[in-house]
Amino acid sequence: MYINRRTNKVKAGCMDEMVKLVKAEIERTESNGTVYTAEFGPFDVMVIDFSFESLTEYHKFWDEWFATPEAAKFMEKWYTLVEPGGTNEFWFVN
């Protein structure tokens, strides 16, 4: 199994809206995403983890998602809430 971890800096004062946006999209797509915000740790950072059985499954999920009109609408809102940068990691679970 693999974990796709996406870490992003959220604009100050926008975390609640960002969490709501991401959780709604996870629910809409019935994906296995988990949203993390720090109780202690870096300020204004959101981490989202998705699990995949393979790199092929990862590519299929994201290629199909980005091809939808809902993804375009989501990303339009996303860019109003997030700072430039972030990370997109793919981890093997031992």
Describe the function of each predicted region.
Residues 1-94:
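Short S/T/G/P-rich N-terminal loop/turn motif that feeds into the first structured element of a domain
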